[in-house]
Design a protein with these regions (language model features):
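An N-terminal hydrophobic leader/cap segment in hydrolases
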Residues: 27-84
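A short loop-to-beta-strand scaffold at the N-terminal edge of the catalytic core in hydrolase folds
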Residues: 87-98
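The serine-hydrolase catalytic nucleophile loop
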Residues: 112-125, 139
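Conserved alpha/beta-hydrolase
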Residues: 127-146
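Alpha/beta-hydrolase active-site loop
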Residues: 150-171
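Alpha/beta-hydrolase fold nucleophile elbow
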Residues: 171-183
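Hydrolase active-site cap/lid region
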Residues: 191-231
Length: 231
């Protein structure tokens, strides 16, 4: 009798252990699913294309008004629309402003969810003053360029090479070419620096590019997701 009771007790313990293991496994699988879905939602929130309208002009007495009116003026100036195919087949577009034939060329890459005209106001003015030519590029998944997702430099760095190759072929190997980017664009041109460019690509200018994609994602998660949601 005692032996039978002992066996029943052992059996009950075994069943309890199996239940605990089953619960742990289910919770683990559930956590993985939640993590996967959450990661996808965060990625979509940050990196998916948005058909962002141009910012409102604001009022005539603020700094934004002056900046955006300059951007609108640049957009309306005479320029040549350039379309290239990236190495993965994505159509990329930019606008070329010629100040002087055979002058050095600056290929400009805008910032995170930015606009080439808006972010490009300072370099356009400098190029006009120095009599350089400038190409304002719309990065993938922004404005006129194709793509549903941008990758914070993972793919965009190769787009820099494609733009450099196009410029070297179009303007000739004797034309000095510089890549310049601001914010995310700055990080992109820096990330491209170890890739194979034509010899006419002479330099890279990084204006306040982020240091790591991880920090960039963390910053945008905090500003884009609901308050209290862990990042």
């Amino acid at each position: 009798m005692k032996q039978r009771v002992k066996q029943l007790a052992i059996t009950e313990k075994s069943v309890k252990k199996k239940k605990i293991v089953a619960v742990v496994i289910i919770m683990f699988i559930f956590s993985i699913i939640i993590l996967g879905v959450g990661s996808k939602l965060v990625f979509q929130k940050i990196c998916e294309r948005r058909e962002t309208a141009w910012p409102d002009l604001g009022t005539a007495d603020d700094e934004q008004y002056e900046w955006l009116t300059e951007a609108y003026k640049i957009k309306q100036k005479n320029n040549e629309k350039i379309v290239i195919l990236a190495s993965d087949g994505t159509k990329l577009e930019g606008h070329y402003y010629e100040r002087k034939k055979n002058a050095p060329l600056v290929i400009f890459f805008h910032g995170f969810r930015g606009h080439s005209y808006v972010d490009g106001v300072p370099i356009y003015k400098i190029a006009q003053k120095e009599k350089w030519n400038v190409l304002l590029v719309s990065m993938r998944a922004h404005d006129e360029s194709e793509g549903n997702i941008f990758t914070l430099g993972v793919k965009e760095r190769y787009d820099c090479v494609d733009w450099g190759n196009w410029a070297a072929k179009h303007f000739g190997r004797e034309t000095p070419i510089f890549l310049m980017g601001i914010s995310m664009g700055g990080a992109v041109v820096t990330m491209s620096s170890n890739l194979d460019f034509p010899d006419s690509v002479c330099g890279i200018i990084d204006d306040c590019g982020f240091t790591t994609s991880t920090k960039m994602l963390e910053l945008n998660c905090k500003s884009s997701l609901p308050k209290g949601m862990p990042v």
